[in-house]
Amino acid sequence: MKSILIEKPNQLAIVEREIPTPSAGEVRVKVKLAGICGSDSHIYRGHNPFAKYPRVIGHEFFGVIDAVGEGVESARVGERVAVDPVVSCGHCYPCSIGKPNVCTTLAVLGVHADGGFSEYAVVPAKNAWKIPEAVADQYAVMIEPFTIAANVTGHGQPTENDTVLVYGAGPIGLTIVQVLKGVYNVKNVIVADRIDERLEKAKESGADWAINNSQTPLGEIFTEKGIKPTLIIDAACHPSILKEAVTLASPAARIVLMGFSSEPSEVIQQGITGKELSIFSSRLNANKFPIVIDWLSKGLIKPEKLITHTFDFQHVADAISLFEQDQKHCCKVLLTFSE
């Protein structure tokens, strides 16, 4: 089989490997589609602090089970599945309270362990989620990005009457917008970004107001309009955003952070405590695959609005370059694998 391997930062190769055999409790997935994420680019370029090399990247992937290991029902062969990349121990403190995404021995497929940019992938059977026949392949491969939005909104608990500010109209920001509008029916969703084309995408995904904040600070715009967001979600992940979010937020608001920067964020306790703000962080997803599969089955989210490009997996280097360089027109890039 062929696999996409990052041998070391900035060194990508398509290599020939033996087709793996699933061990006890595992299934083998013949991969059909995979999605490129920012973290794949970061691993490729050497900017992900958690990655170990050499590494087969890819944590968004979909395919068909073609073999099972001991202890897995043979009836699962032939199942269409999307794979949850979060592999956890199941018994540490985070796992015991429903947060396998921060397991003390967390392994993320495509980061800590080999992922799905390969013609075949062996994964824990419990991580392979069956996809209803009514859900198309290209939607199924988008489940993992939407689980990020499910995790974020699980923390933020949006209501219809919230005024929500989403920083960032990249792929994750747009999944969050779709969930806010399609699942939670939030009446007022504001998106801030510095690229007009991305803001247009935000409108297509349901944003009520899309603001280019490259020239005028959000504080000025919101003061003029009398707006105080009750929920702020940082999908741009810059360390400067927390300070601004605390200033902009309504009293009793919630703020959800997703960034992994090692740079400090300057924030004053008085700004947080004076308004009794609730600040959450969100990493990966905590058992959100069934939730997103249900949303897809009910037509509450529209993954097709985010897919802009598709490449054969053997052109992955071109696909990643496009993803990195064309932020105006490129949103979600899919890789196809041989039938």
Curated annotation (Swiss-Prot):
Cofactor requirement: Zn(2+)
CDD domains: Zn_ADH7
Family: Belongs to the zinc-containing alcohol dehydrogenase family.
Residues that, per the record, bind Zn(2+) 2: 89, 92, 95, 103
Function (record text): Not known; probable catabolic enzyme.
InterPro entries: ADH-like_C (IPR013149), ADH-like_N (IPR013154), ADH_Zn_CS (IPR002328), GroES-like_sf (IPR011032), NAD(P)-bd_dom_sf (IPR036291), Zn_alcohol_dh (IPR050129)
Keyword annotations of the record: Metal-binding, Oxidoreductase, Zinc
Binding note for cofactor: Binds 2 Zn(2+) ions per subunit.
Protein name: Starvation-sensing protein RspB
Organism domain of life: Bacteria
Enzyme class: oxidoreductase
Regulation: induction: Repressed by RspR.
UniProt keyword annotation of Lipoprotein present: no
Entries under Gene3D superfamilies matching the protein: Medium-chain alcohol dehydrogenases, catalytic domain, NAD(P)-binding Rossmann-like Domain
Any one GO molecular-function label of the UniProt entry: zinc ion binding
Pfam family, one: ADH_N
NCBIfam families named among the record's database cross-references: PRK10083.1
Binding site for Zn(2+) 1: 37, 59, 144
EC code: 1.1.1.-
